[in-house]
């Protein structure tokens, strides 16, 4: 049994602060697989399809033909979707890429009329700061 604790957040239209500094787009497995493989070598076509079946869709901020940061929307219920699987390349952390992908996913969730949720490990202060800056 894990002793890990999590901090849970919710963002609303009133609290949301979009951060349009970097362009972010949805990833398509068929065309973006080479980029995904460089960023996330463990991901397989089967794993990607399984994630899609479980309600995940991934987006990325790309620069210089590389994914700099990635996040997903997890459509876990009819009423609420979660910002999930946020990761930034270690060598480019602190540049706002995580905020860009989190804001992109959050805007998608709120635009669909769903509750936007987010959770992270209680000791992950960097991710908590990102969430708070976006309006969670």
PLM region spans:
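Conserved acetyl-CoA pyrophosphate-binding loop and the N-cap/start of the following alpha-helix
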Residues: 91-92, 96-101
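A short, internal acetyl-CoA/4′-phosphopantetheine-binding micro-motif in the GNAT/acyltransferase core
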Residues: 86-93, 121
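A conserved beta-strand-loop-helix scaffold within acyl/acetyltransferase catalytic domains
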Residues: 46-89
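Acyl-donor-binding surface of acyltransferase catalytic domains
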Residues: 1-22
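Conserved active-site alpha-helix within GNAT-family acetyltransferase domains
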Residues: 1, 99, 122-136
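Conserved GNAT acetyl-CoA-binding A-motif
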Residues: 1, 109-121
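A short beta-loop-alpha structural element at the N-terminal edge
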Residues: 23-35
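Short hydrophobic clusters on alpha-helical segments that form packing/core surfaces
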Residues: 83, 101, 105-109, 127
């Amino acid at each position: 049994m894990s002793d890990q604790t999590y901090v849970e957040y919710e963002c609303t239209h009133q609290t949301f602060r979009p951060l349009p500094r970097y362009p972010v787009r949805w990833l398509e497995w068929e065309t973006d697989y080479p980029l995904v493989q460089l960023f996330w070598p463990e991901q397989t076509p089967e794993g990607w399809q399984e994630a899609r079946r479980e309600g995940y869709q991934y987006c990325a901020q790309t620069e210089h033909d590389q994914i700099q940061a990635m996040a997903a929307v997890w459509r876990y219920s009819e009423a609420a979707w979660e910002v999930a699987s946020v990761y930034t390349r270690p060598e480019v952390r602190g540049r706002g890429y995580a905020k860009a992908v989190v804001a992109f996913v959050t805007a998608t969730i709120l635009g669909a009329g769903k509750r936007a949720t987010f959770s992270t490990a209680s000791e992950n202060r960097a991710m908590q700061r990102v969430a708070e800056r976006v309006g969670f």
